[in-house]
UniProtKB/Swiss-Prot annotation:
Gene encoding the protein: atpE
Keyword list, A-Z: ATP synthesis, CF(1), Chloroplast, Hydrogen ion transport, Ion transport, Membrane, Plastid, Thylakoid, Transport
Similarity section: Belongs to the ATPase epsilon chain family.
Locations listed in the record: Plastid, Chloroplast thylakoid membrane
Membrane topology: Peripheral membrane protein
Origin superkingdom: Eukaryota
Record's GO cellular component terms: chloroplast thylakoid membrane; proton-transporting ATP synthase complex
UniProt lineage: Eukaryota, Viridiplantae, Streptophyta, Embryophyta, Tracheophyta
Description of how the protein assembles with itself and partners: F-type ATPases have 2 components, CF(1) - the catalytic core - and CF(0) - the membrane proton channel. CF(1) has five subunits: alpha(3), beta(3), gamma(1), delta(1), epsilon(1). CF(0) has three main subunits: a, b and c.
Gene Ontology MF annotations: ATP binding; proton-transporting ATP synthase activity, rotational mechanism
Name used for this protein in its record: ATP synthase epsilon chain, chloroplastic
């Protein structure tokens, strides 16, 4: 038995395929979803989506949004998403370094919050590349 997973951003469909299992980062922690999972709607945190398909684990960096799970259908609507395999490791590391520098020199509450958000996004992209499947 499989799950139909659809990952959408405002601009494109990132993933639309059958999968065996997912592990999703939500605002209240990670949840694993297998076929016949109880229906749920949840907020999606900035984090890694792990996808098991054809005996392999794949990763995707998600940048926050919402998920709806029910009847073996998973729809995830996020602000942005990138498959781990599509992320350039060198560019991701450079972005992380820049985000860390910006966080260190942030002044004021607003700058600190924005820098922290950029840092979380950069770390998530690097993690999506480095997750051992």
């Amino acid at each position: 038995m499989t799950l139909n997973l659809c990952v959408l951003t405002p601009n494109r469909i990132v993933w639309d395929s059958e999968v065996k299992e997912i592990i999703l980062s939500t605002n209240s922690g990670q949840i694993g979803v297998l076929p016949n999972h109880a229906p749920i709607a949840t907020a999606v945190d900035i984090g890694i989506l792990r996808i098991r398909q054809n005996g392999q684990w794949l990763t995707m960096a998600l940048m926050g949004g919402f998920a709806r799970i029910g009847n073996n259908e998973i729809t995830i609507l996020v602000n942005d998403a990138e498959k781990g395999s599509d992320i350039d490791p060198q560019e991701a590391q450079e972005t992380l370094g820049l985000a860390e520098a910006n966080f260190r020199k942030a002044e004021g509450k607003r700058q600190t919050i924005e820098a922290n958000l950029a840092l979380r996004r950069a770390r998530t992209r690097v993690e999506a590349i480095n997750v051992i499947s």
